[in-house]
């Protein structure tokens, strides 16, 4: 979340940023934040004054008794008791103001960087780069859901029987392809210096608030109400929360973690042709990169993550493009985000396979994730993460773009993992 210092010292800049993100009632919300903060400070000033007075009186009581000034000593005792009661009310008011302030801050999104373009939605995103070679397929090329059925790779109907729509069953070589991609992505991350983490796939509410999925995305998360736990929408949540309430040494940075997990998203309101097959699922596999760094290094870290994801797509021989997201299409928590999309030749559309984001200090402030400098100062870290990669649409693109009369061609980079050139 935004810090009080950010809001009080840069109010106009914060408001401009929130307007770029199309955050409703930005002026009213920030005015409330400032009001709650003023009340908290006013009560703190009175409380500090009262505590100083009570402390001074308490010290004087013994001396007054020695001097035989019993009435003055009793008056001092009475005043100390009175101040204690007043201070209880002041502390209660301060606690309530702090709670109200915290609740309000949780509802305010991150402020985008100046380099984020203006815009309302996906149509306003800026194409930064197009790479890879588009595949020329015959007019009767099949979409991936038909290829999956033809080669008995994925059974969507069986998933509906077992669970419901959006929970496919991978079979035979389809399951092997999933495992091949997961191992390939993890191996590539390891080569780039990432330490693999195997985290839980359920988290508590504190973790959801720490990375910003709560309260913003609560309606899109699967909630186990009996135990008050949430199925993770991405490994970002448990991996980043490893560093909640942690003060790191400067020499430990950057931290580079990767994790493969199943991810769960309700995707409420999704329907139509764009959600067919693997295009949008409730459960899917993904490898996630998480980095924690010093503020002055986070731009470089972000670029290194972008280069890593681009390298994966190049090795998979897929046509891709990189988008700089506009303010209106960015996530609640991001300060800067780039999306990677692969082209689906059979569907004639682009499919998002990765978002790589810099959160500045937004998540770190929620998490209380800090580092100690060489000068012994404590500063908030910058957090970054990105998919490397999400499997469903990668599988869709691989099947569609590599279909041949003989079967599905496997990219050279995956052959060591699949053991064959053709499915």
Where do the PLM segments sit?
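N-terminal alpha-helical targeting/anchoring segments
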Residues: 1-135, 153, 157
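TRNA-recognition modules of translation machinery and tRNA-sensing kinases, especially anticodon-binding
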Residues: 27, 129-422
């Amino acid at each position: 979340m935004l810090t009080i210092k950010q809001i009080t010292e840069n109010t106009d800049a914060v408001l401009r940023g929130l307007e770029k993100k199309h955050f409703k009632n930005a002026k009213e919300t920030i005015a409330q934040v400032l009001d709650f903060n003023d009340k908290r400070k006013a009560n703190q000033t009175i409380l500090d004054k009262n505590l100083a007075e009570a402390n001074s009186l308490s010290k004087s009581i013994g001396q007054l008794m020695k001097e035989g000034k019993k009435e003055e000593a009793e008056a001092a005792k009475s005043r100390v008791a009175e101040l204690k009661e007043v201070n209880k009310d002041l502390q209660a008011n301060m606690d309530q103001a702090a709670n109200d302030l915290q609740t309000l801050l949780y509802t305010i999104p991150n402020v985008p960087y100046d380099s984020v373009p203006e815009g309302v939605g996906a149509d306003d995103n800026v194409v930064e780069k197009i790479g890879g070679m588009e595949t020329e397929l015959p007019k009767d090329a099949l979409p991936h859901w038909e290829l999956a059925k033809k080669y008995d790779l994925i059974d969507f109907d069986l998933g509906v029987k077992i669970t419901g729509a959006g929970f496919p069953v991978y079979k035979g070589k389809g399951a092997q392809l999933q495992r091949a991609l997961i191992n390939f992505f993890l191996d590539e991350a390891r080569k780039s210096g990432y330490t693999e983490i195997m985290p839980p796939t359920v988290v508590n509410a504190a973790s959801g608030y720490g990375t910003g999925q709560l309260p913003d995305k609560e309606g899109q998360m699967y909630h186990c109400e009996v135990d008050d736990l949430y199925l993770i929408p991405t490994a970002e949540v448990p991996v980043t929360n490893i560093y909640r309430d942690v003060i790191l040494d400067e020499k430990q940075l950057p931290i580079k973690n990767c994790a493969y997990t199943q991810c769960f998203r309700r995707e409420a309101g999704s329907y139509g042709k764009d959600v067919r097959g693997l295009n949008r699922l409730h459960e899917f596999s993904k490898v996630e990169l998480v980095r924690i760094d010093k503020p002055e290094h986070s731009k470089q870290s972000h670029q290194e993550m972008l280069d890593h994801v681009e390298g994966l797509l190049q090795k998979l021989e897929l046509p891709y493009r990189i988008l700089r997201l506009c303010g209106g299409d960015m996530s609640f928590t991001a300060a800067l985000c780039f999306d990677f999309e692969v082209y689906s030749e059979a569907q004639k559309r682009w499919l998002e396979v990765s978002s790589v984001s810099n959160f500045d200090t937004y998540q770190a402030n929620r998490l209380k994730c800090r580092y100690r400098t060489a000068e012994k100062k404590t500063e908030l870290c910058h957090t970054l993460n990105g998919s490397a990669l999400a499997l469903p649409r990668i599988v869709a693109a691989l099947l569609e773009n590599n279909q041949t009369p003989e079967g599905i061609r496997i990219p050279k980079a995956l052959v060591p993992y699949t053991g064959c050139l053709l499915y």
